Every structure is written in structure tokens, then in C-alpha cells.
Curated annotation (Swiss-Prot):
One cellular component (GO) term of this entry: plasma membrane
Organ and tissue specificity: Detected in cerebrospinal fluid (at protein level). Expressed in brain, placenta, small intestine, stomach, uterus and weakly in the prostate. Isoform alpha has been observed only in the brain. Isoform gamma is expressed in brain, placenta and uterus. Isoform delta is expressed in brain, kidney, placenta, prostate, small intestine and uterus.
Source organism of this protein record: Homo sapiens
Alphabetized UniProt keyword annotations: Cell membrane, Cytoplasm, Glycoprotein, Hydrolase, Membrane, Phosphoprotein, Protein phosphatase, Proteoglycan, Receptor, Secreted, Signal, Transmembrane, Transmembrane helix
Binding-site positions, substrate: D554, C588, S589, A590, G591, I592, G593, R594, Q632
Domain Tyrosine-protein phosphatase: 393-647
Cleaved signal peptide residues: 1-21
Protein name from the UniProt record: Receptor-type tyrosine-protein phosphatase R
Family: Belongs to the protein-tyrosine phosphatase family. Receptor class 7 subfamily.
The EC number(s) this enzyme carries: 3.1.3.48
Gene assigned in the entry: PTPRR
Function, in words: Sequesters mitogen-activated protein kinases (MAPKs) such as MAPK1, MAPK3 and MAPK14 in the cytoplasm in an inactive form. The MAPKs bind to a dephosphorylated kinase interacting motif, phosphorylation of which by the protein kinase A complex releases the MAPKs for activation and translocation into the nucleus.
Chain positions with Phosphoserine modification: S272, S339
CDD domains registered for this protein in UniProt: R-PTPc-R
InterPro entries membership: Prot-tyrosine_phosphatase-like, PTP_cat, Tyr_Pase_AS, Tyr_Pase_cat, Tyr_Pase_dom, Tyr_Pase_KIM-con, Tyr_Pase_rcpt_R/non-rcpt_5
Length: 657
């Protein structure tokens, strides 16, 4: 009876021990159970609930005391990869609630950003131990429907309080290249299962995001192949632009330097050194850099050796020398400063003397004699014949001296500021002088204009001047008022590639200095525009007719002389209607080319009408004596003959009628 009672009690005790229900140390039971099941045993009750909720296969999992049929089926289909995390050795003395070893679960691999998933928690990630990380891993695997071995915890991000993880295929070795794309993983994520399984972690966000290591790796890829090419291309373009700018700058400097050298070469006057000797020394010759011919006399400058006496100038005939080819006269310092010409002088042996002596050169004498005496009178038939021989007219034109003015011959300081072209200057003997604003201001009397003689040498029949500049418009209208000019003829556009003339008249009314200009009427003709103007100064008025001829083409002569001839006839009619008034003002840009053509044609037509013959050569020479360079080119010289021939045919037609 007693044995019968003890046997059931003994069996009960054995079953309880096998079930692990003793209150003592049950670590041996945990190890045996884990070995049989192949799964970690959850310490907490909610962890056991998580284990029950993990469904690897859609069928229900039936458990046995020693094996699991579902696990056997799964193992046949997919070979379970052992966890790569090292497990701590079994130590009975360790408390299961405090297993500290989170570094064993964190892989810290440089995973590409496209494969990383970041899970943000409410729980402090710094307090997660290996047990909680395993729970987290299994919960994520359950939400994804994957095995825990496929979920890898890569990093714990303390600043964001989040866990960085990635998922790998089960049949491949875990590695960076095997990680599944984060977007594909998130599409298969069951949010409800995730929150139910890991409610104690307080998951707030699941998103793909770059990790710090990957960000560093991508930052290191700034100098990638594409980036390197982009930088090289940018630097190449920059170098090319800088090089082009430097080349353009150098070309500009060279161009400006060549212009300065040309100007200096044109303006430079080389004067021979003057030999200074004591009073008793013998005379020495003076050599000029240009020697056209020999002269019978030479000048000696004799100076007191002490430099106290006045210089004595004597003429000797002992030696033949070549005088300077330039006409010189005594000039002072103020005059030299007013000129833009550089002088090269040998002043090494000079004392307190004035070394300049005015001597007309043979070349100047010959040029002036030619201008005064040249003549070729043409009858009407000869005029028609010579027009057909352009080469004869060109040869004749080339023999006419230009008679340009040397800047030193103008005794007005700073006169260059009122010249449109530095080499086109008014002849001093025929220059128009304005009434000065005050006695000491000599510049206010200057304007680049000359009186031009007309038919039969009539004085002041015309005024040839340059196109007004912005700073000479007042001077122009002062000249028109002062000379009481009835007609102004303008033969240029305002701009032909470069500025030729400024708009010096108003649209309706304008005041220029002391002269008020009113536009009364405007008449548009085929080739020119006529404006009737009224000039007022105080209580006095003057009527002026302004002709603006715009049909002259750039850099050549017109194809037909008819428009210019008609303009000349209209101006001549107005001039005759205003007898007793001043000269006709004619200007183009420089005041010598087209201006010379108009005046030469006007004089030649009067000569044809009065005498029946014409001397165009003499007319042009007379114009150049009054203003150098008039009728500037051989083409213009031919054009004058064409205009005269056309006028002659008109006269013949009128005679027949």
C-alpha cells in the first residue's frame, strides 16, 4: 500500500523536473530546451507571446515535446544559416535579465544607402542589451515574413534614437552586395504585425535613410570620375577665357602703341643741332637731317663765352649747307605747350638764346609758286574730252601740293581741343577769328574754319569748316551770326561708321551760347532737306537757310553728279537773293573733301557761265591756298570735272532753246 502511494508521487516529481518547474536553477533545462527547439527561449512572458505570433509558414505550427514538424519542413526547403553573432558561453552564474553584450549583435558594415532601413524608437537605444536586440530582430523578421537570420542589425544611432538594419537573402552568404533594396523590403513590411510584436519598443518611424558610414563614403566620392571630368572641363574653360582676355588686352596695347608711334612719327620734327662758337672762332656748317638742295648761305650763332651778351646772328657764304626743310619762327614756351607736336632738339650747348630762325624752304616756295601759277584752261569740248581720260586727271591731281598746316603755326594754346582731326587745321592767313569773350581768352577766338575766295578771287565768298563737335556747337552758331551767313550747306551724315558731325540744330527751338535758333519750316527734297531758320540775339534777327545733303555715299563719290549740281544751283539762287550778306558756310566732317568738291563745282559753274571756259586746276589750287587739302582725293577731283561737264551740257541745251 505504501509502495503504491510512493510510486505515483515519484513519477510526479520526475515529470515536474522534466518540465522545468523546479524553483531552483533551471539553466540546464533552458539549454536542453534551446538545443531541441533550435530557438532562443524568451525570458519574459511577452517574449513568449512574440514567439507564438511568428508564422514562418501559412500552416499552423504544431509543437512536440522533443521536435517540431514545421521546422523540419522549413529546414528541408531553406537551409537555416547559423547566426553570425557570437553567443556568450553558458555561465550559470549570469542572471538572464542582465545579459550585457550588444556589440555582438551590431555588424557595423558599410551598407549602401539604397539597402538601409532605419527604425526610430521611443525606447532609449543605449539601454538595449543582446536579449532585447534579438527580440527586436525576431519581431522585424515576423513583420517581413522572413527568417530572423535574414535580418541584420547594422548600427545603433544614439542621436536619432534609432536602429539601422538591412535584410539579406537566405540562400546567400551575408555581405554588402547581397543586401536587399530597402524599398523592396518596405513594400513587404506588415506594419500591424510590427507594432503588435514590438509594442514595448515604441516604434515611431520606419524609413530608408543613409547611414553615417555611407555618407562618408559618398562624400569621399566627390572626386569620382564624373566629378573629376567636370572640374577639368570647368578649369579648362576658365583658362581659355582668361587666356583670350589676356590676348585681347595685349593686342589692344599693341594697337594703341602703334597708333601713338605713328602719331609721334607724323608729328615729330627733327631739328639739326646749332653750333655755338665764341666770337672769334671760325664758322661751321649746320647739317639738316633732310637735304633737298644746297643753299649759298649759312647762319652762325655767336654767343659770348660767359653767356652774358645777346646772341649775334651773322650770315656767311663760305660754306654751302642745306637749310631746314621746315619753316620756323621764334616761338615761346607758352606756344610750344599749346601744340601737340613733340620737338627733338639738341640743346646741350645752348645758353640763354632763342635758337629758332624763320627760313622759307625751297620746297615750300616751290609748292606755293605752283599753287599760285598752276593753270589749265579747258574749253567746253576739251572738258568733255578730259572727263573721258581719268588717268590724265589723276596724274594732274597728284602734282597739286596739299598745303597742310603745321600745328606750330597756330599761336593759340590748347587749340587741339577744338579740332575734329589733329592733322586738319585752318590756314592761319585765312582763318576765321571769332570775337573773344574776354581779352585774355585767346582760345575763344578759335574755330577750325577758313574764308574761301570765290569766282574771280572774290574775298570771303565761302567759309569752309569742319563738322561741329559737342564742344564747338556754340562757336559754330556764333560764327554764323558774326559773319551774317545766309546759307549753311551740310554734306555729311551725322554718323558714317564713326561720328562725322553732331546734331547742332534744334527740333524747334534752341539756345547756343548767346544765339537763339528757331526752326520755322522743314522741306524734304529727294536728296537733301531744307530748313528755314531764324537766329536771334537780343533784338536782332537773321534768316538762314540750312541745306542738309545726305546722298553722298560713304568712302566714295556719288555715281551721279546731278544731285550735287542741283544743290549747288539752289544755293547759288539763295546767295544771289541775299546780296550784301556774308559768306555761304559749307561743311562736311573734316571740311576739305566734300566741302572742296561743292565749292570747286560752284566756282567752276560760274566760270563756265561767264567765260565759256573752266580752269578746274587753278580753282583747286586757289582753294588749297585758302585751306589745305581741299578736294581731298583724285576721285573727288574727277567728280568735280564730271559735275562741270554736266553743267556744260545744261548750258548747251539752254543755248539751243
Amino acid at each position: 500500500m505504501r509502495r503504491a502511494v510512493c510510486f505515483p508521487a515519484l513519477c510526479l516529481l520526475l515529470n515536474l523536473h522534466a518540465a522545468g518547474c523546479f524553483s531552483g536553477n533551471n539553466d540546464h533545462f533552458l539549454a536542453i530546451n534551446q538545443k531541441k527547439s533550435g530557438k532562443p527561449v524568451f525570458i519574459y512572458k511577452h517574449s513568449q507571446d512574440i514567439e507564438k505570433s511568428l508564422d514562418i509558414a501559412p500552416q499552423k505550427i504544431y509543437r512536440h515535446s522533443y521536435h517540431s514538424s514545421s521546422e523540419a519542413q522549413v529546414s528541408k526547403r531553406h537551409q537555416i544559416v547559423n547566426s553570425a553573432f557570437p553567443r556568450p558561453a553558458y555561465d550559470p552564474s549570469l542572471n538572464l535579465l542582465a545579459m550585457d553584450g550588444q556589440d555582438l549583435e551590431v555588424e557595423n558594415l558599410p551598407i549602401p544607402a539604397a539597402n538601409v532601413i532605419v527604425v526610430t524608437l521611443q525606447m532609449d537605444v543605449n539601454k538595449l542589451n543582446i536579449t532585447l536586440l534579438r527580440i527586436f530582430r525576431q519581431g522585424v523578421a515576423a513583420a517581413l515574413g522572413l527568417l530572423p537570420q535574414q535580418v541584420h542589425i547594422n548600427r545603433l544611432i544614439g542621436k536619432k534614437n534609432s536602429i539601422e538594419l538591412f535584410v539579406s537573402p537566405i540562400n546567400r552568404k551575408t555581405g554588402i552586395s547581397d543586401a536587399l533594396p530597402s524599398e523592396e523590403v518596405l513594400r513587404s513590411l506588415n506594419i500591424n504585425v510590427l507594432h503588435q510584436s514590438l509594442s514595448q519598443f515604441g516604434i515611431t518611424e520606419v524609413s530608408p535613410e543613409k547611414n553615417v558610414l555611407q555618407g562618408q563614403h559618398e562624400a569621399d566620392k566627390i572626386w569620382s570620375k564624373e566629378g573629376f571630368y567636370a572640374v577639368v572641363i570647368f578649369l579648362s574653360i576658365f583658362v581659355i577665357i582668361v587666356t583670350c582676355l589676356m590676348i585681347l588686352y595685349r593686342l589692344k596695347e599693341r594697337f594703341q602703341l602703334s597708333l601713338r608711334q605713328d602719331k609721334e612719327k607724323n608729328q615729330e620734327i627733327h631739328l639739326s643741332p646749332i653750333t655755338l662758337q665764341p666770337a672769334l672762332s671760325e664758322a661751321k656748317t649746320v647739317h639738316s637731317m633732310v637735304q633737298p638742295e644746297q643753299a649759298p648761305k649759312v647762319l652762325n650763332v655767336v654767343v659770348d663765352p660767359q653767356g652774358r651778351g645777346a646772341p649775334e646772328i651773322k650770315a656767311t657764304t663760305a660754306t654751302s649747307v642745306c637749310p631746314s626743310p621746315f619753316k620756323m619762327k621764334p616761338i615761346g614756351l607758352q606756344e610750344r605747350r599749346g601744340s601737340n607736336v613733340s620737338l627733338t632738339l639738341d640743346m646741350s650747348s645752348l645758353g640763354n638764346i632763342e635758337p629758332f630762325v624763320s627760313i622759307p624752304t625751297p620746297r615750300e616756295k616751290v609748292a606755293m609758286e605752283y599753287l599760285q601759277s598752276a593753270s589749265r584752261i579747258l574749253t567746253r569740248s576739251q572738258l568733255r574730252d578730259v572727263v573721258a581720260s581719268s588717268h590724265l586727271l589723276q596724274s594732274e591731281f597728284m602734282e597739286i601740293p596739299m598745303n597742310f598746316v603745321d600745328p606750330k603755326e597756330i599761336d593759340i594754346p590748347r587749340h587741339g581741343t577744338k579740332n575734329r582731326y589733329k592733322t586738319i587745321l585752318p590756314n592761319p592767313l585765312s582763318r576765321v577769328c571769332l570775337r573773344p569773350k574776354n581779352v585774355t581768352d585767346s582760345l575763344s577766338t578759335y574755330i577750325n574754319a577758313n574764308y574761301i575766295r570765290g569766282y574771280s578771287g572774290k574775298e570771303k565768298a565761302f567759309i569752309a569748316t569742319q563738322g561741329p563737335m559737342i564742344n564747338t556747337v556754340d562757336d559754330f552758331w556764333q560764327m554764323v551770326w558774326q559773319e551774317d551767313s545766309p546759307v549753311i550747306v551740310m554734306i555729311t551724315k551725322l554718323k558714317e561708321k564713326n561720328e562725322k558731325c553732331v546734331l547742332y540744330w534744334p527740333e524747334k527751338r534752341g539756345i547756343y551760347g548767346k544765339v537763339e535758333v528757331l526752326v520755322i519750316s522743314v522741306n524734304e527734297c529727294d536728296n537733301y532737306t531744307i530748313r528755314n531758320l531764324v537766329l536771334k540775339q537780343g533784338s536782332h534777327t537773321q534768316h538762314v537757310k540750312h541745306y542738309w545733303y545726305t546722298s553722298w555715299p560713304d568712302h566714295k563719290t556719288p555715281d551721279s553728279a546731278q544731285p550735287l549740281l542741283q544743290l549747288m544751283l539752289d544755293v547759288e539762287e539763295d546767295r544771289l537773293a541775299s546780296q550784301g550778306r556774308g559768306p555761304v558756310v559749307v561743311h562736311c566732317s573734316a571740311g576739305i573733301g566734300r566741302t572742296g568738291c561743292f565749292i570747286a563745282t560752284s566756282i567752276g559753274c560760274q566760270q563756265l557761265k561767264e567765260e565759256g571756259v573752266v580752269d578746274a586746276l587753278s580753282i583747286v589750287c586757289q582753294l588749297r591756298m585758302d585751306r589745305g587739302g581741299m578736294v581731298q582725293t583724285s576721285e573727288q577731283y574727277e567728280f568735280v570735272h564730271h559735275a562741270l561737264c554736266l553743267y556744260e551740257s545744261r548750258l548747251s541745251a539752254e543755248t539751243v532753246q
